[in-house]
């Protein structure tokens, strides 16, 4: 089985920020809604949604403040345990 057989779409895109309130307000003006606000450790986190696009922004005060400063892209998958085994087998090749 190939890795692509497990993927179902993008889960979210992670973007760090130095000022979460300004970042949230920016995305709200673009039509996003706040799906969730929480705290992860010491970092404030917000999930912002526009249709099927979800952005996770979190305040870590270490954001690069440069174009393309995306921290991560999360992919939805089915059967993550089986996918993990497939990835491990591919790493051994």
Predicted regions mapped to residue ranges:
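Vicinal oxygen chelate
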Residues: 1-6, 17-20, 37, 47, 73-93
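Conserved beta-strand in the GNAT
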Residues: 56-58
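Conserved short hydrophobic patches within well-ordered secondary structure
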Residues: 47-48, 70, 77
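Short glycine/serine/proline-enriched coil/turn segments at secondary-structure junctions
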Residues: 64-66
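Core segments of cupin and vicinal oxygen chelate
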Residues: 7, 15-54
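N-terminal beta-strand motif that seeds the catalytic metal site of vicinal oxygen chelate
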Residues: 1-21, 70-73
């Amino acid at each position: 089985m190939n890795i692509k057989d497990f993927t179902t779409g993008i889960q979210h895109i992670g973007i760090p920020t130095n000022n979460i309130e300004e970042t949230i307000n920016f995305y709200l003006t673009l039509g996003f809604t706040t799906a969730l606000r929480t705290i992860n450790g010491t970092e404030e986190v917000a999930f912002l949604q526009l249709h099927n696009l979800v952005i996770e922004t979190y305040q870590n005060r270490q954001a690069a403040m440069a174009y393309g400063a995306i921290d991560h892209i999360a992919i939805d998958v089915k059967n993550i345990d089986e996918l993990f085994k497939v990835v491990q087998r591919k790493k051994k090749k």
